[in-house]
A protein has these predicted regions:
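Intrinsically disordered, low-complexity terminal regulatory regions
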Residues: 1-88, 92-175
Length: 175
């Protein structure tokens, strides 16, 4: 699925990503501007924190976005990638960054479905939500990137992602 601009929670099937989108929307409401990183409190996202990563938008001398840097990687991201890439750079324009590029360009949340082929031979499909943040309220300088693995009924892995997902879903269901 190609990256899609998200305007309403109903456009997102996954309960974890819906909760993160609703939180971002709440922080953006009534401001007439994008929320800043300073507006985001990890305590508010405790139930879904394993799904959340923060990505810094690096700009060139002309102010154009060119590279992304993982500031913090959530447990889902670490499990999907098979390593913690905190601090690593990613060139904007690489296939994985389509949703990020669109969120930066539009200043709007973007949803995309991704398929990842880890070295162990399994196939993992997951939803990705990119929510833009801007210190000045306009120019995107950070992204909340949230991922939620999709599992088929009889294809649940026994790894950490599954434990994170179950715990987060149980917490969300209690609310």
């Amino acid at each position: 699925m190609s990256p899609t601009i998200i305007d309403h929670e109903a456009q997102i099937a996954d309960v974890l990503l819906r909760q993160i989108f609703a939180y971002w929307q709440e922080k953006a409401a009534g401001r007439g501007a994008l929320p800043a990183r300073a507006d985001i409190d990890p305590v508010d996202l405790a139930a879904v924190l394993p799904a959340v990563s923060l990505i810094e938008v690096r700009r060139d001398v002309m102010g154009r976005p060119g590279r992304l840097r993982y500031r913090v990687m959530g447990g889902f991201h670490v499990e999907i990638m098979g390593r913690d890439a905190t601090g690593e750079l990613l060139d904007l324009g690489a296939g994985e960054s389509d949703a990020a590029a669109q969120a930066i360009a539009t200043g709007r949340p973007i949803y995309a479905e991704r398929t990842f082929y880890p070295a162990n031979g399994t196939v993992l499909t997951f939803g990705t939500l990119m929510c833009p943040l801007a210190t000045d309220g306009r120019k995107v300088d950070m992204l909340i990137c949230a991922v939620a693995p999709h599992y088929k009924a009889n294809d649940l892995p026994v790894g950490r992602v599954n434990r994170f997902a179950r715990a987060a879903l149980e917490t969300v269901a209690r609310r």
